[in-house]
UniProtKB/Swiss-Prot annotation:
The organism of origin for this protein: Arabidopsis thaliana
Family: Belongs to the BI1 family.
GO cellular component, one term: membrane
TM spans (from-to): 53-73, 85-105, 113-133, 138-158, 167-187, 189-209, 228-248
Protein name: BI1-like protein
Name of the coding gene: LFG5
Length: 256
């Protein structure tokens, strides 16, 4: 059969078809190999999973941004939340209640998405209240810093994974650090910390959540199974949200 004008036939006889397993972006074809030893087919599936998780995460962050904007820009909504401790307390408790069914039904569609939406909305209102109680300039600074840190840490983790580095060892260290943060936060309710201690606590908190971003991104690349996309998105969402709130608190205290 004649070839269309401008096209030429290419013989595949001299090409090793098995080499396709090692194709990556550096060769100009396919997608970058996520980490050493990953087969071509598994690499393609893993990239699809990662795109799905980041798609869900982007939707969560967008929803949080929109709800926070509504709370900040609408004084009646803000007054209702800040003037009703019961409502605000309920919104703070709901995410903790939803964590359990989210874990149980993370594979059951569409229940998992409904629970995820409720989880995100309840947290978004609390974030909105925190932003409404802070000067707009500081909120913008915290947002820019958070985006910069998250982007840098994510890029580094993907690069490190490709070079064969593993961050699973961070799990026990970060969990212990998180327990220390929770206990210290509880102690602050009865014995307020001084300015220096508060600054140290804020810096340590930011460091812990930065570590969690690296750890959970590494899990996304290597360890989360393909049906755990909800759990992966929730983990990264909480990491980013906690880092933003920590930076917001540090900047607010520094401004005061």
């Amino acid at each position: 059969m004649d070839k269309p004008y401008g096209y030429a036939s290419v013989s595949m006889s001299g090409i090793d078809r098995s080499a396709g397993k090692d194709i990556d972006l550096e060769m100009g074809v396919g997608e970058a190999t996520l980490y050493p030893g990953l087969s071509y087919g598994e690499n393609q599936l893993r990239w699809g999973f990662i795109r799905k998780v980041y798609g869900i995460l982007s939707a969560q962050l967008l929803l949080t941004t929109l709800i926070s904007a509504v709370v900040v820009l609408n004084p009646p909504v803000n007054d209702l939340l800040t003037g009703s401790p019961g409502i605000l307390l309920f919104l703070c408790i709901v995410p903790f209640i939803l964590i359990w069914p989210l874990h149980i039904y993370h594979q059951k569609h569409p229940v998992n998405l409904i629970l995820l939406a409720l989880f995100t909305v309840s947290l978004s209102f609390t974030v909105g209240v925190s932003c409404a109680m802070t000067e707009g300039r500081i909120v913008l600074q915290a947002l820019i810093l958070t985006l910069s840190v998250v982007g840098s840490l994510t890029a580094y983790t993907f690069w490190a994974a490709k070079k064969g580095k593993d961050f699973s060892f961070l799990g026990p260290i970060l969990f212990t650090s998180l327990i220390i943060l929770v206990v210290t936060s509880f102690i602050q309710m009865f014995f307020p910390l001084g300015p220096t201690s508060v600054a140290v606590y804020g810096g340590f908190s930011a460091l812990v959540f930065c570590g969690y971003i690296v750890y959970d991104t590494d899990n996304l690349i290597k360890r989360f199974t393909y049906d755990e996309y909800i759990l992966a998105s929730v983990a990264l969402y909480l990491d980013i949200l906690n880092l933003f709130l920590t930076i917001l608190r540090i900047l607010r205290q520094g401004d005061n």
